[in-house]
Amino acid sequence: MKKTLQIALAATFFAGCASTSVTSSASKDNNELVQNQLFKIEKIIVNGKTFDPKNAEESPNISFENNKFYGYSGCNRFFGSYQTKADTLQIEGDRVASTQMLCHPMDVMDFENSLLSNFKGTFKISNENGKLVLSNDEMKIFFK
């Protein structure tokens, strides 16, 4: 009886561990990747053209938290609202709100203008080589 009880307890323990592992990896979907984290923007591709923020004084970044996003685009701060469903992120409204400073060099402004004017609509959330990527028909954003 004692041996049977030990075997039953061991089987329950291992079955519980196995189901916990499967459940936690299955429940971790791509939209959880964006929640409550600060991401540095590595580069963006807009309509086939690559924009790199290498000359920005501070790395462009974005943070997603409680259906609000906040970021720095190389010169100005920006913010807005979003919703996630399955593997998509929907930017609410037809444009992102931002401060309006003029900055140099011009490639920083080009990066910023391309990012902010195209950061709208629905983006697919994906994980490429361990890095977060947001993409739609017009733009692809690569994060560090």
Language model segments and positions:
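Sec-dependent signal peptide recognition
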Residues: 2-8
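Lipid interaction determinants
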Residues: 6, 17-144
